Regions:
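Solvent-exposed, non-transmembrane regions of integral membrane proteins
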Residues: 1-192
Length: 192
């Protein structure tokens, strides 16, 4: 068998915001980390003592370094990242901070917001919900089969089950590599 990758697609869960300890990098509160899921329509939420208000969202963004800061702009191309401009107000101290926050990508670095000497607000990498590969499979006898392989939805060709195993997670949605597992069990039909 030979497998040609035609296309790779991934559906990701919405991005989320979390607080981390600046010294250890651990999420806060340590025993039960909180997160703010940035689902469509969410404009504010609470993380510990911080009220977070989303001012602008750019789902396909690129970071641009200016003289003294980093900002984000629309970028509909390979390596685009998710970015939000937000304000965080500490409900106890009334300290206010605002900045861009982004999970980054293999091209653009992540951007965190340092809230105080102890705490920063971050957007961790987005988690995959579903990923699949459109492939063309060539068999020894000259057949060509084009289909989509997804996790837990293998493709059966010439007695082989081809499973979607993983992808290049450093590139995320931009992965140009799919990892497959090929399983052949000629005895299986005889058992049943």
């Amino acid at each position: 068998l030979a497998i040609e990758l035609k296309d790779f697609t991934i559906d990701e869960y919405p991005p989320k915001l979390m607080l981390i300890d600046n010294e250890t990098g651990r999420t806060l509160p340590e025993k039960a980390p909180e997160h703010l899921l940035l689902e469509e329509g969410v404009t504010e939420g609470q993380l510990s003592d911080w009220l977070v208000t989303i001012r602008q969202t750019i789902p396909w963004a690129a970071s641009v370094a200016t003289e003294d800061t980093v900002k984000f702009t629309e970028f509909h191309s390979m390596g685009a990242t998710y970015a939000v401009y937000l304000q965080a107000i500490n409900q106890k101290t009334k300290t206010a901070k605002e900045s861009w926050v982004s999970c980054g990508s293999f091209i653009f670095p992540y951007k965190a917001l340092r809230l105080d000497s102890l705490t920063s607000l971050i957007m961790p990498e987005r988690e995959p919900q579903r990923f699949a590969s459109t492939v063309k499979v060539y068999t020894e006898d000259g057949k060509q089969v084009e289909d989509t392989i997804a996790v837990n939805h293998p493709l059966n060709v010439a007695g082989w089950n081809i499973y979607q195993l993983s992808y290049d997670d450093t590139k995320g949605r931009w992965s140009d590599i799919s990892v497959f597992e090929l399983v052949r069990d000629p005895w299986l039909p005889a058992v049943y």
